[in-house]
Amino acid sequence: MYGNYSHFMKFPAGYGGSPGHTGSTSMSPSAALSTGKPMDSHPSYTDTPVSAPRTLSAVGTPLNALGSPYRVITSAMGPPSGALAAPPGINLVAPPSSQLNVVNSVSSSEDIKPLPGLPGIGNMNYPSTSPGSLVKHICAICGDRSSGKHYGVYSCEGCKGFFKRTIRKDLIYTCRDNKDCLIDKRQRNRCQYCRYQKCLVMGMKREAVQEERQRSRERAESEAECATSGHEDMPVERILEAELAVEPKTESYGDMNMENSTNDPVTNICHAADKQLFTLVEWAKRIPHFSDLTLEDQVILLRAGWNELLIASFSHRSVSVQDGILLATGLHVHRSSAHSAGVGSIFDRVLTELVSKMKDMQMDKSELGCLRAIVLFNPDAKGLSNPSEVETLREKVYATLEAYTKQKYPEQPGRFAKLLLRLPALRSIGLKCLEHLFFFKLIGDTPIDTFLMEMLETPLQIT
């Protein structure tokens, strides 16, 4: 095709100067336009006999260099130009090129592809003529296309997998012929013995497969250790101990019934909350690593989450109560009392979104403790000196809770997710309760005790 280079060749008009294209404590969150320049279109050589000169029509198809999917190409490209005739009287002689001879010699290689729009014309990206530049893309075992260097030898995926299986399973093969079978792309599966021997002869290393297996095992063990270290560092037993240590004894409630509450239900709730705030500090100190934080960060976390922590506690305590809640003081607050006091809406949400859900899934004390620890370790609390440390502690509680649910309730694979789904409801209800408390504090009709008043003096939760 490229035989006679002494022929005169015609080029498209403007070949010498092809134009280029130019491109033109509160819950608060923690927290290249490149130009693609198309490559100049290169004219393609074509044979033109001396006796019958022809004019070559150029199809202007600029080629854009491939880049990242995030690159923005801003150059405005016009439509392809039409056929351009060469100016009369201008004939150019195509100089002989040793590179063109290389193209002739490897014209069957897959490296040579036709230029888009001009079928039959080889592209100008000539392969290197250095020894081995083409061989390295061929599988040394069967001659198929190589996918890279595997176990010391350039090989295809098929021969790589065959050698790895042979070594890992310690397979032994036999040859039915004379141990000199031809191994190529079409017949590589006919004799496993000769294929394996050729792998060894070409330089594949058994120890490379064994080292790869060892690295995979070590990586798996390391990942397993990382997964278990989270709940070993935050043992669920200690979280359960913290819950049991501060929970009022059920026998202290006596035989109190719904009628024991003689005062306004809101007053009873505020009084119980004030008492529970003292025990809340003791509970937090028993949670692993909480006391390791700075004193300032401990105060910030308690101020940011005290309302949600108390609501979670009395909601879980009330799962056995019919249509009401059980306070830490032993008093019951019935739904009807809450409605008469003007807090029926938020009371109904507590019963529906928290108490009822906890009862349906039979949430145990360990799960309750983990959920409360997740609320406690809030990395978004405003003013923390080291939010990343708090976030790490929260992630450890996540890992502990997930491991616990998988081990204790293997028949409920979605239990961990169900538990976490209670947190948004707890957050929303906690904010609404704060609004009520601030209202009662503002109007002054409800007596609010000292500790609770101190918490309300810094309204961190209102966002």
UniProtKB/Swiss-Prot annotation:
UniProt keyword list = Acetylation, Cytoplasm, DNA-binding, Metal-binding, Nucleus, Receptor, Transcription, Transcription regulation, Zinc, Zinc-finger
Instruction: Identify the stretch(es) annotated as Disordered.
Output: 18-53
Q: Name one Pfam family in it.
A: Nuc_recep-AF1
What positions does the domain NR LBD occupy?
231-459
A single GO CC term for this protein reads: cytoplasm
Q: Which GO terms describe its molecular function?
A: DNA-binding transcription factor activity, RNA polymerase II-specific; molecular condensate scaffold activity; nuclear receptor activity; nuclear steroid receptor activity; retinoic acid-responsive element binding; sequence-specific double-stranded DNA binding; zinc ion binding
* InterPro entries (alphabetical): NHR-like_dom_sf, Nuc_recep-AF1, Nucl_hrmn_rcpt_lig-bd, Nuclear_hormone_rcpt_NR2, Nuclear_hrmn_rcpt, Retinoid-X_rcpt/HNF4, Znf_hrmn_rcpt, Znf_NHR/GATA
Where are the annotated NR C4-type zinc-finger regions? Answer: 139-159, 175-199
Might you name a Gene Ontology BP term for this protein?
A: nervous system development
Q: Which domain of life is it from?
A: Eukaryota
Region entry Modulating, spans: 1-138
Spell out the Polar residues composition-biased ranges. Answer: 21-33
Q: In which tissues is it expressed?
A: Expressed in aortic endothelial cells (at protein level).
DNA-binding region ranges: 136-211
First-listed, main subcellular location of the protein, grouped into a coarse class: nucleus
> What subunit structure does UniProt give?
Homodimer. Heterodimer with a RAR molecule. Binds DNA preferentially as a RAR/RXR heterodimer. Interacts with RARA.
Q: What does this protein do?
A: Receptor for retinoic acid. Retinoic acid receptors bind as heterodimers to their target response elements in response to their ligands, all-trans or 9-cis retinoic acid, and regulate gene expression in various biological processes. The RAR/RXR heterodimers bind to the retinoic acid response elements (RARE) composed of tandem 5'-AGGTCA-3' sites known as DR1-DR5. The high affinity ligand for RXRs is 9-cis retinoic acid.
Query: In the UniProt entry, what is the domain comment?
Result: Composed of three domains: a modulating N-terminal domain, a DNA-binding domain and a C-terminal ligand-binding domain.
The Swiss-Prot or TrEMBL record describes its family as follows:
Belongs to the nuclear hormone receptor family. NR2 subfamily.
Spell out the protein name for this chain: Retinoic acid receptor RXR-gamma
> What's the name of its gene?
RXRG
